[in-house]
Every structure is written in structure tokens, then in C-alpha cells.
Amino acid sequence: MNLKQEVESRKTFAIISHPDAGKTTLTEKLLYFSGAIREAGTVKGKKTGKFATSDWMKVEQERGISVTSSVMQFDYDDYKINILDTPGHEDFSEDTYRTLMAVDSAVMVIDCAKGIEPQTLKLFKVCKMRGIPIFTFINKLDRVGKEPFELLDEIEETLNIETYPMNWPIGMGQSFFGIIDRKSKTIEPFRDEENILHLNDDFELEEDHAITNDSAFEQAIEELMLVEEAGEAFDNDALLSGDLTPVFFGSALANFGVQNFLNAYVDFAPMPNARQTKEEVEVSPFDDSFSGFIFKIQANMDPKHRDRIAFMRVVSGAFERGMDVTLQRTNKKQKITRSTSFMADDKETVNHAVAGDIIGLYDTGNYQIGDTLVGGKQTYSFQDLPQFTPEIFMKVSAKNVMKQKHFHKGIEQLVQEGAIQYYKTLHTNQIILGAVGQLQFEVFEHRMKNEYNVDVVMEPVGRKIARWIENEDQITDKMNTSRSILVKDRYDDLVFLFENEFATRWFEEKFPEIKLYSLL
């Protein structure tokens, strides 16, 4: 297989949803149908001691939520699929955002009873901004929920995107019989003891079956006829531009409708895309020269070894283990001899990868999120990955002063993962951490104790707003007021932490010569 054929066989996507919509369960079932795992786990089964394959961190297993982005690769038919199961909790939107920079499409999971929820909307907007094609899986049809037309209308009106139902449900909850596949005109029954049924071109059953007397079946056929009479053909170009989403109905927990979705996904999802550089050069996935970028760093994937993995998306060319690459930020060459693929916390050495693949590089502190690696004589760098402005700030210290070495190592590694941000006061060197949401601090405290054996003391600093400074040379000590704290971030850039919006406006009016700015 040549490079072009290899690249065309790659499909790389992230799954996005509001917490508890069934995102991690869908991930499990996709792995199950691909043969990548023999038994699909479930995040609900905590009493059994079985946890979802993609929820590998101890705190995730205890809470039943995803707080990191898991990366898994599996083969299906003639395709190699890279799937990223993203954090569903809103406090981890920063990690999710970076993950969405590394994929070519997204799968949006919606709970049929709840419809579009806040986190779904937030992540959808990120996909829309990037023009990422979105597939929709409406989940939990075996429970009572909103009617199909109501759900489609909600998607179209709330998200401003066209919908195209690929299948249609018969009933819901206790009366859920199955789904009608529009393309094959077949009925896939929900219960295993039922056989697949066939419809003719007029949507009449070709076999005798008691379902013909069922009101749910009659209603489903009437609704489907209305959809068909609308006459809109599936527009693949609209999908690829992010203007249309194909919609699938099913129940991930019951293994139903998942394979139907997976078969359609590999048919319609895009292959790896070209990427823009800072130099405004478009790098094609078919370019012979290797390139990639780091979008995530994860410490302690193996707690026994205190390792750290940098997740790299291959953009072009072929990666070969042992090859020499240049880290563009430092302009230093390095030989990559330790590279790995993932099934959550299970790792396997990677000798070869092409555009679209996600591989892990063992990191001794060389990499930062957003780093570009290139082979040959290439000199470009990919565009920076976005960073969020924190909204909660805490002073942090070790409870036991004898644990300072472990404390600082833990801080350094967890900050480099990008889930929490680091600041230091100018004169006292007091460490202040910033986060998008409170859960990040809870996870930070949990991981410091479990992974670094350090109990930490955290104290709110009474500041809610961070503003960076364009003209640092004009900052003086008199600008450090009772309503603000002047700190340095991990890159030694000056940052003001303000008490509230009023304090920020007061500062801007009193010192108009100082140009402040925020991140995302």
C-alpha cells in the first residue's frame, strides 16, 4: 500500500456530548463491533469492578466521568480509525478544545430525552468554527424521550445546521421495536429474537408480520413518508463543509444502531485534511515530508513508572520509529525511538504511522502543547493551539514541607498537561493555579495525592479575571493594587489577576496606556 492509499484509509474523529449522554458507552460499543475489545464495559457498572475501556484514570473510574481525552485506534473493514473520547465535563473544555484541533470529524451524542444540552452546544460551536463535519447519534431510544421530529427541529434551530436522518425509529421506550434504514429499506429489530424485515419502494412490508397492526409502526411509516416527500437528497458536500449532519437513532448501551452508524461513518467521513501553518502554507497529508503537532500531554499513564506521553497528530508524510525530526520551537533535532499507540491505558509500540494517526511520544520534558515536529529540511510551524482564560484561582502549597520535591514535580507535570495553569507572584514566589472550573482543582488535588503522594493545601485568592499585558515594559509597582495581583505565568509573561469586572474596568480607566488582553 502506497502513502496515498494509507492516508485515504484513515478516519480520525472525536466524540462530543454533554455528561451522561452516553458518549463513553458509544466509544466502547464502537470498539466492540470493530473487534478491538471482546467485552464492552459500561461506566454504570461500578459495583462490578468493571470500568469503561476509555476511562483509565483512577479518578475517572471512581466518578464515572471522563476528565482526560482518551485515544484509541482500531481497524474496521479496510479502514484504520482513530477515535478520541473527550472529556464530557464542562470544566475540561480546554482539553476538549485542543482535542478537536486534532480530528477531521466529530460525532455528537444526544440523549433523546434531553435533546441539546449546554455542553453539547458549546462543543458544537467549536466544531462549527473549525468547519468540522459532524455526525449525530441520538441515543437511549429504548427509554422514553422526545419525538424524532422534535429532536431534528431542535438540532436545526439550536445549532443552525441541516439534518438528514439516515434511519428512523419505530416507537420509543417500552414500545421501541427498532429502526428503519432509509437506504436499504430494511427494519432492524431491537430484540434479538426478531429477524430483519424488508420494505418495498412504497414502504410496505414484504413479509407478513404482526407489527403491521402496531400503531408505533404506522406512525413511523407516516413520519418517514413525510421525510421522503420532502425530497431532499443526502448532500455529502454539505456534510464535509459542516452545514449538514447525518442523524442516526439507536441505543449504545443496548448495542443497537451502533454498527449501522459505524458502517455509514466509514463511507461518508472525510480522510485526513490539509493543515495551515503560521507561514500560511497549506500542508497536504500526501506530502512526502513528515510533519506533526503535539496537542496533548498526559503524565502518569503508567503510575508505576511516572511516565509522560505527548500525543502527536501526524499531518503529512510517514512517521517511522527511529527517524530524526526537528522540534521547531527549539530548532533542535531529535531521534524518536519510543513511540506508542493506545487502547486507553494499554500501549503498543508504533513503528509506522501516516497522516491522521495519533501516536504517543515518550516525553522527558522536551515537548509543549502546540509544538510542531518536522522531518527533512522543512522549516514551518503549525498554528498555535488555543488556550482558555482561567476563571478560578487558588494558592497552592504542600501540606508537608518535606514533600517539596514531589510537590514541584507534580505541579510541573500536571501543568504541562494543560488542564491547569500556573502562575507565580513576583516577590514571594507563591504558586497560584488557575482553572476553567472547580472540578479541575478537585482532580488536581486527587492526582497529587494518588500519583505523587503529596497532600496539598489550596486557598482561594479572591481573584476571578486574568489579563495579559501587551506592553510589559510600562508596568510599575504602583499598578499593583488591593484589587489586583501581578503575577508571571509559566512562560514568564506578566499577568494581572483582578478581583472582578469592576476592578478590571477601574484599572483600564486609571492606566489607559496599559494594553490588556485575555485568552479565549
From Swiss-Prot:
Main location class: cytoplasm
GO molecular-function term, one example from the UniProt record: translation release factor activity, codon specific
Ranges for domain tr-type G: 8-277
Cellular component terms per the entry's GO annotation: cytosol
Protein residues bound to GTP: 17-24, 85-89, 139-142
Keyword Protein biosynthesis: yes
InterPro entries listed in its UniProt record: EF-G-like_DII, EFG_III/V, G_TR_CS, P-loop_NTPase, PrfC, RF3_C, RF3_dom_3_sf, RF3_GTP-bd
Tagged with keyword Protein biosynthesis: yes
Pfam families membership: EF-G_D2, GTP_EFTU, RF3_C
Location of the protein in the cell: Cytoplasm
Gene Ontology biological process terms, A to Z: regulation of translational termination
Keyword field: Cytoplasm, GTP-binding, Nucleotide-binding, Protein biosynthesis
Disulfide bonds: none
Similarity comment text for this entry: Belongs to the TRAFAC class translation factor GTPase superfamily. Classic translation factor GTPase family. PrfC subfamily.
Function description: Increases the formation of ribosomal termination complexes and stimulates activities of RF-1 and RF-2. It binds guanine nucleotides and has strong preference for UGA stop codons. It may interact directly with the ribosome. The stimulation of RF-1 and RF-2 is significantly reduced by GTP and GDP, but not by GMP.
Protein name per its UniProtKB record: Peptide chain release factor 3
Organism per entry: Staphylococcus aureus (strain bovine RF122 / ET3-1)
